[in-house]
């Protein structure tokens, strides 16, 4: 069984083909980073127009990469939400049109379920149950996962997501968009302990997050200490340490609450090397395991949508020919498979 996956929720156009016996057969990705760089963030209208230009050519490239033709595809999966409404509509329209033309089912996929299941693409996939840390530019959530579609929200950010805080703080430090990875690179040159940022909401019970205050703290620190290269690196280090420590503390609480021994990290920020190292060390001490996808599958991609579509297709999920998307779509609303 082969599923074509289409990802167009934000500023990456991702197309992939997944075979339930052979694994990933094709993976094509186009990033719009250069398109949005001058604006310091994603411009929704530009994102939608670029998806229109890139989606069909990438589908053709994926078919060529896999050596398949349209008649070899058994279902078409597409991201139906959450995300930018215009961008989502491009992928949904193309996906449903192809499904109709090829006479195969169309499978709407939840973007964050795609991220959550991305580690399943690896050679050593996690088994249920586990705690999932979904950490990206738009989401920071802790989820109890006991099966496909069996998701319980344990905590989430009440303001900025961790990835958003990374990008905003990077901009304060004069870094280009997207600044999160550049901030992490700068932080590697910083001196630990010169500046100490707060660990938000760790001094009270609960599993919710708040990262907007760290951006303000960074702005004040920059104002008071100048912007020479070493100072900027030291501020970046302090900021990253604060975010990573906060995420680690909350993960510990979630694992204690659930009693689970497995932790899954997913989303763009899960590619952060410092976060990976700290959580791996933490889970080793707890005699547990941590799982994450390879870096290219942490950010938005078609492979995770193709895989999630395969899982949902086997569970009987299909969509009619109407085109509808959900820019806001709580993960907990998904049915169990």
Swiss-Prot record:
Which residues does substrate bind?
Answer: 134-138, 167, 180, 272
Any one cellular-component term (Gene Ontology)? cytoplasm
Q: Quote the InterPro entries the UniProt record gives.
A: ATPase_NBD, Gcp-like_dom, KAE1/TsaD, Peptidase_M22_CS, TsaD
Query: How is the co-factor bound, per the entry?
Result: Binds 1 Fe(2+) ion per subunit.
Q: Which Pfam families match?
A: TsaD
Name the SUPFAM superfamilies for this protein.
Actin-like ATPase domain
Q: Which GO terms describe its biological process?
A: tRNA threonylcarbamoyladenosine modification
Its subcellular locations are: Cytoplasm
GO MF terms listed in the record are:
iron ion binding; N(6)-L-threonylcarbamoyladenine synthase activity
UniProt: Fe cation binding residues? 111, 115, 300
NCBIfam families, per this entry?
gcp_kae1, T6A_TsaD_YgjD
Question: What PANTHER family is this protein classified in?
Answer: TRNA N6-ADENOSINE THREONYLCARBAMOYLTRANSFERASE, TRNA N6-ADENOSINE THREONYLCARBAMOYLTRANSFERASE, MITOCHONDRIAL
Task: Give the protein's recorded name.
Answer: tRNA N6-adenosine threonylcarbamoyltransferase
Protein species of origin:
Escherichia coli O157:H7
What's the encoding gene here?
A: tsaD
């Amino acid at each position: 069984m082969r599923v074509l996956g289409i990802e167009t929720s934000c500023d990456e156009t991702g197309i992939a083909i997944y075979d339930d016996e052979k694994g990933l057969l094709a993976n094509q990705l186009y990033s719009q980073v250069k398109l949005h760089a001058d604006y310091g963030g994603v411009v929704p209208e530009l994102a939608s127009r670029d998806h229109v230009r890139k989606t069909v050519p990438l589908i053709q490239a994926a078919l060529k990469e896999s050596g398949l033709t349209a008649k070899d595809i058994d279902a078409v999966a597409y991201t139906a939400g959450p995300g930018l409404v215009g961008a989502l509509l491009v992928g949904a329209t193309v996906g449903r049109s192809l499904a109709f033309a090829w006479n195969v089912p169309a499978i709407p996929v939840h973007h964050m379920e795609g991220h959550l299941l991305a580690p399943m693409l690896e050679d050593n996939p996690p088994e249920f149950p586990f705690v999932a840390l979904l950490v990206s530019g738009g989401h920071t959530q802790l989820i109890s996962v006991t099966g496909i579609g069996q998701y319980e929200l344990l905590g989430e950010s009440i303001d900025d997501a961790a990835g958003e805080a990374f990008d905003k703080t990077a901009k304060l430090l004069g870094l280009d968009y997207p600044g999160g990875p550049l901030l992490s690179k700068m932080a590697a040159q910083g001196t630990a302990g010169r500046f100490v940022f707060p660990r938000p909401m760790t001094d009270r019970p609960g599993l919710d997050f708040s990262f907007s205050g760290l951006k303000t703290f960074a702005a004040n620190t920059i104002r008071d200490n100048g912007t020479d290269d070493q100072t900027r690196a030291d501020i970046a280090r302090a900021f990253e340490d604060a975010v990573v420590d906060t995420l680690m503390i909350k993960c510990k609480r979630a694992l204690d609450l659930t009693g689970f021994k497995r932790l899954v990290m997913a989303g763009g920020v899960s590619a952060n090397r410092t976060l990976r190292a700290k959580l791996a060390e933490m889970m080793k001490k707890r005699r547990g395991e941590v799982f994450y996808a390879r870096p290219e599958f942490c950010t938005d991609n078609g492979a995770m949508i193709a895989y999630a579509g395969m899982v949902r297709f086997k569970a009987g999920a299909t969509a009619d020919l109407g085109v509808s998307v959900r820019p806001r779509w709580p993960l907990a609303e998904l049915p169990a498979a």
